[in-house]
Amino acid sequence: MRTPLFVAMFVLSIFATPIAHADDAWMQSQRQWREQRAEALSQPDGWLSLVGLHWLAPGRHSVGKAADRDIVLSAGPDALGELELSEQDGVDRVRWYPPKDVVALRYNDAPVGTESIEVGADSSDHPGVITWSGGSVQLIERGGKLGLRVRDAEAPTRTHFQGLAWFEPDQRWEIKARFEAKPAGSTIPIANVLGQLEATPNPGRVVFEIDGNHYTLEALGDPAESLFLIVADRSNGKQTYGAGRFLYTDAVVGGEVMLDFNRMVNPPCAYNAYSTCPLPPPENRLNLAVEAGEKTYQGAH
C-alpha cells in the first residue's frame, strides 16, 4: 500500500522535472546567444575589424595606404583612387574616382571599372561600401560630417580576440516592462562620443520594477520590431564599460515588452577607437547596479 508521503513525493517529482528542464533550456539559450554575439563581433566585417576613421574636407583627395596619399589608410591597396566631397543643391555629395591601374576593388559587391561612382553614406537610402580582399571603406555621416570608416580583417583587435566576459545569467534580470507610447514624431536629444547632439526618434519609454522600485528608460527603435535602449547604471566604470551599455528587445506586444538585462552588451567603442557610439541620455541613468550582461572588455582596443 502506497503511503500519502509516497504519493506526495511522486506528484512533486512530476511537476519538478519540467521546471528544471525549463531552467536548463533558458540557460542554454543564454549561452547560445552569447556565443552568437562573440561570433558576430569577430566576423571580418564586425566591430573588431575597425582600424580607421577619417573625416572628409571639401575638395578632391587621393586615398590609399601609400604614404603619399592625401588620406593615408592603415589597410588596403596603396592607391584607392580619389574621393571628392562637394556641395550640390545644398547637399554634400561624395564621388569616387577609382584608380586607373585597376586593383581587385568592388562597390557594394559589384566589380569596379574606371568610371566614377557617387558614394552613399550609411544614413542614406543607398549606402555604399568599397571593398577589397580582407577590407573595406564605408562612407558614414555623423552630425552633418562625412567620414571614411576603414575595416581590416587582419586587425590585431580581431585576430587577437580572446572572447567576452559576462555576468552569470540570472532569470531575475529578465523583467517584463510596460511600454508607454509617445505622440508620433517625438524625439530625444542623443549625444555621441564625438560631442555631437542629435534629435533621435523616441517612440516611447519602458516602465518596470526591480526589488519594489520603479524605473523608466527612454526607448529608440521601432516598437513593432525592436526597441533600442542606451543605458547607464552604477556598475559602469567598475564591472562594466564606463560609457554605458546597449539593450535590444523583441517587439512590443499588447503594450508590454521583455527586458532581458542578461543580454545587455557593450557599445562598439568598447572594442576600438574608431566608433561613433551614442551615449545614454540623462533619463536613462539608472540608480542601481545592473550586475547582468556583458562586463568590461579586457582585450586590446
Model regions and ranges:
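An exposed acidic His-Trp-rich patch
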Residues: D109-S123, H214-R263
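Bacterial N-terminal signal peptides
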Residues: V7-A16
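Surface-exposed beta-loop interaction hotspot
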Residues: T131-E198
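Extended, aromatic/histidine-rich regions of cofactor-dependent oxidoreductases associated
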Residues: L164-W166, R234-K238, Y248-D250, E256-M258, ...
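Boundary at the C-terminal end of the N-terminal hydrophobic targeting segment
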Residues: A20-A22
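Flexible, glycine-rich surface segments
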Residues: R178-N236, Y241
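Positively charged n-region of N-terminal signal peptides that target proteins for export
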Residues: M1-P4
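Forkhead-associated
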Residues: L50, W55-S123
